[in-house]
Amino acid sequence: MIDLKKFEVWFVTGSQHLYGPETLEKVAEHSREIAGGLDATPQMPVRVVFKPVLTTADAVHELCREANNAAHCIGLVTWMHTFSPAKMWIAGLKALQKPFLHLHTQYNRELPWATIDMDFMNLNQAAHGDREFGFIGSRMRLDRKVVVGFWQDLEVISELGTWARAAAGWHDAQHLKVARFGDNMRNVAVTEGDKVQAKIQLAYSVDGFGVGDLVARIHAASDRDVDHLVSEYEDTYTLSEPLTAKGKQRASLLDAARIELGLRHFLKDGNFHAFTDTFEDLHGLNQLPGIAVQRLMADGYGFGAEGDWKTAALVRTMKVMAAGLDAGTSFMEDYTYHLENGGLVLGAHMLEICPSIASGKPSCEIHPLSIGGKGDPVRLVFDSQTGPAVVATIVDVGERFRMVINKVNVIPPEVPLPKLPVARAVWIPEPNLAVAAACWIYAGGAHHTGFSLCLTAQHLQDYAEMAGIECVLIDNDTTVHACKNELRWNDAYYRLTGWR
């Protein structure tokens, strides 16, 4: 399980010695109260830790270096309670290697109109102190998040929580290892990409393995462990008749359990948290992994089909960002359309949709698979939960990585789907199918996505800014004309600024 409470964001307040010890004591007192208040809110997924008020360039530099080396620190929240000359922040911000959020707030919500004096004015200077700090961030061309409002307002707290989830995803990516069993599906373009640049830009590493390495782990699984896992299947899911104890295809369920055990051991021993496979490279396997992949995703692993390592890493990052939230997150594919009444997307895949998005108890079934040349694979079948969701992809467009996001609304299937033997989700894309699909195609978005009913576009946008990658959002405000222009402008911007 993914526990975000092991992570910290440090609450860092800037000031200067000009104001004297009494004022600085009040600055520290207020800052400690704000940090504690944010830490106690349910919207904050990580710990908020107060740090001593910074009043010198050396103190700023030391704290930023300390943050870089602190394993559990995922970023800073900065606030200038008083005026803090920004030149003293330059060395520290140049050294800082973790994301930071600039909280533009003040301790008091209202002005004490009848009693306000210069003591109050000299203490509560964020209105201009934060502008000074904002200038140096812009002057240094630093990517950061700016949140404005009173620190106790729900909207402000929610923005901070969203950013913290993105920071947790970015922090996880710094150590993320993706295992690829086999290569890409042959001749497919969008699943390719520059793994060296991914390591430089997105931090994670991608390692390839022959399927035989996995097969050896699968064969090593004990019969006792297989029986125990099958018993868990029986307790958790509704087994179709062929997979029951006396069913004709019970052996396939045992094979599926053995595959899951082998995969788990391989990933755990290698400290991998995302993986890919491909139906074109199954030598030594009796079936394409189905239920094994689904259950691993439910436990927080990222997955990409047909060798799609970028989507595998993205799904893992989205899993981390979504930890502790209701609803689920999954690998997904835009599979087919319903083109009446504005259009619907039926999202699915051959097997590998995460049961965290299931609307009810999944059914464990076995059906033929016409590709791969192996036995019938076992999979979980269900309809998705409904409600607002996002689909997102990261593609390599040659000189940079691009994230494409589409806001969608998941609805129940218009009629039951008794003959469709895979998990599925039906959604209406924003603003509609025609515009969303056209813009997605113009942007070069992949057919594989990360799908989430609990994350928002803002989570993903915050992550993209931390990673320094292009981000294209398709929502109710999008038009094809504006999207094409945005893509042109982005292309010019990234060419002028260089491949980061």
Swiss-Prot record:
Pathway terms, separated by semicolons:
Carbohydrate degradation; L-arabinose degradation via L-ribulose; D-xylulose 5-phosphate from L-arabinose (bacterial route): step 1/3
EC number annotated for this UniProt entry: 5.3.1.4
**Which residues take part in binding Mn(2+)?**
306, 333, 349, 448
Recorded hits in InterPro entries, A to Z, give:
Ara_Isoase_C, AraA_central, AraA_N, AraA_N_sf, Fuc/Ara_isomerase_C, Fucose_isomerase_N/cen_sf, Lara_isomerase
* The keyword Manganese belongs to this UniProt entry's keyword annotation: yes
GO biological process, any:
L-arabinose catabolic process to xylulose 5-phosphate
Reactions catalysed according to its record:
beta-L-arabinopyranose = L-ribulose
User: Could you confirm whether the keyword RNA-binding appears in this record?
Assistant: no
- Gene3D superfamilies according to UniProt: 3.40.50.10940
Broad EC category: isomerase
What function does the entry list?
Answer: Catalyzes the conversion of L-arabinose to L-ribulose.
Q: Which NCBIfam families match?
A: PRK02929.1
Can you tell me which family this protein belongs to? Answer: Belongs to the arabinose isomerase family.
| Protein name per UniProt | L-arabinose isomerase
Whose protein is this, by species?
Answer: Koribacter versatilis (strain Ellin345)
> What is this protein's gene name?
araA
